[in-house]
Amino acid sequence: MKKGTDLLKKGFAKMVKHGVVMDVTNVEQAQIAEEAGAVAVMALERVPADIRAAGGVARMSDPALIEEIMDAVSIPVMAKCRIGHTTEALVLEAIGVDMIDESEVLTQADPFFHIYKKKFNVPFVCGARNLGEAVRRIWEGAAMIRTKGEAGTGNIVEAVRHMRLMNEAIAQLQRMTDEEVYGVAKFYANRYAELAKTVREGMGLPATVLENEPIYEGFTLAEIIDGLYEVLLEVKKLGRLPVVNFAAGGVATPADAALMMQLGSDGVFVGSGIFKSENPLERARAIVEATYNYDKPDIVAEVSKNLGEAMKGIDITQISEAEKMQYRGD
């Protein structure tokens, strides 16, 4: 597939709409995912639950592992890079992955900025907890958004929170005047000024950033505001994000997947929920069926039977704020 333009990038994202993307750590798992009906796989060395348990620094996977998985399946293969780590993204583009996930599941590389994704030919997916994060990522060039949820927990509550926050923000945006929408764009743009403000404070200067001052990838604050405003106007007009929006972070059962689809998701990412369960192939098939038939409770009920033990979940209240992955990159 020829890659490059925003239209082509978004077109690839739409190709996986209504489907399930599954995390896989080896060729065998990738083949199970393909057999179960996954629309794509996410190739990585460890699923989020293992990344969470191991601690330390989580980085891009070995390119050799990703290439092995790419050679083993006929469906698209995605891979993760760290937030802001442009070089990891360039490596993934060089080996030919179909999409890059600039992911909070890995340790954040840049404390100030995300990758400027419009410089790349390969499409990107990024996580978002709310409309502000989604709009910033879309302006930077993301072709797909997903909820962050809380990866590796098997607990759907944070994914639900993020989808509801997104839906309510879009509903409120539609009731705003264009002038009010512009005010929202100015507020969302402030995140890009943090580096300049921090440097000025360190020099004993007022932490004020002028609108004609370049602050991110050569863009001035005014240009960023205008760019975010354009994205927000499109959201207001459409009543949804202008890109595909998937659910991710805590999906562990067919019912979880169906719930997220009912809340307006265009598809589902499943990380630890499949291969940390007792019967990965049957659970994977069931989640695919539930995602396609989310509005048919009888089918969701049928596919949920006799799947064996689901992954052991984690109560979100037992995770410290510092350990929550969702706060990486806003």
UniProtKB/Swiss-Prot annotation:
Keywords: Lyase, Pyridoxal phosphate, Schiff base
Keyword Transcription: no
E.C. code: 4.3.3.6
Example of a GO biological process term: amino acid metabolic process
Pathway listed: Cofactor biosynthesis; pyridoxal 5'-phosphate biosynthesis
Cross-referenced InterPro entries: Aldolase_TIM, PdxS/SNZ, PdxS/SNZ_N, RibuloseP-bd_barrel, Thiazole_synthase_ThiG
Disulfide-bonded cysteines: none
Binding-site residues, D-ribose 5-phosphate: D23, G152, G250, G271, S272
Record text on subunit structure and interactions: In the presence of PdxT, forms a dodecamer of heterodimers.
Family: Belongs to the PdxS/SNZ family.
Listed name of the protein: Pyridoxal 5'-phosphate synthase subunit PdxS
